[in-house]
Amino acid sequence: MKRFFLFALWLVAFAFAEDMASAPWAKGEKLSYRLSWGFITAGSADMLTLPLGDGKIEFVSVARNNGAFNSIYPVADTIRTISVGERFLPESFKKILNEGSYHSTSKIFFDREGKKAVLSDTVFENSKRKEIKRRVDTTVTIQGYEHCIISAFYRVRSMDLTGKKDTYFSAVSGKKRYSLQVVIHGKETVETDLGKFDCIKVEPMLGDDGAFKASGRLFIWLTDDARRLPVLMTVKIPIGSIRGELVQFRQGTVN
């Protein structure tokens, strides 16, 4: 279940020329979410933006479950990516999944000059990560402006979404280069524990035919202001849906 929400957090990719360096989150940010399945609080997730200097930023996303869910099916997932330049195109991407008995590490290294992305996916026998169950290495041809799925999440927040039409982009994830469509559904008012927010509702869709085949429909509500805070996300799963609600945020220097 947590993997569906993480996929939601990471599933957007853009190559627009808006200046991300001036975005409020570029100087540091921490977003904390409560993950719910129906009326049940299933876990939490944090997304951090950490400036590294020399025009580089590290994006970190961590998700975990809690309570009874953790005793039945423990989840502890982490994603890190380092991006560089005004567009913050990713240099590297690393995803570590620990979900029940499933343990894997995925890496992507972007070679912009060589127009390729080198991907490595490793599944381990157990949580100690010493015995390899299987490993697949893949090289994907890129055009030079592709994002990984986490840096792309911040790309959409830097865009001027007012009045824009549906747009198509591409990103590298898993073992291939994907085509993505972003549908802008318009403005809505969203009420959370943090208050009421005027938002722009967007829907990323995966696949050449515009169908979100991987995990059902995903909706993201971004505040209609310069912060573009993702205050609410929902994604359909085979049984019900997962809701990610922003419960705390901080912009500026974070630890």
Feature map (PLM): residue ranges:
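Low-complexity, intrinsically disordered regions enriched in charged/polar residues
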Residues: 10, 143-150, 184, 243
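Intrinsic disorder/low-complexity signal
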Residues: 17-18, 76, 120, 136, ...
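Sec-dependent N-terminal signal peptides
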Residues: 4-13
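Acidic, serine/threonine-rich low-complexity disordered tracts
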Residues: 18-114, 155-255
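Hydrophobic, well-structured mid-protein blocks that either form specific transmembrane helices
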Residues: 108-154
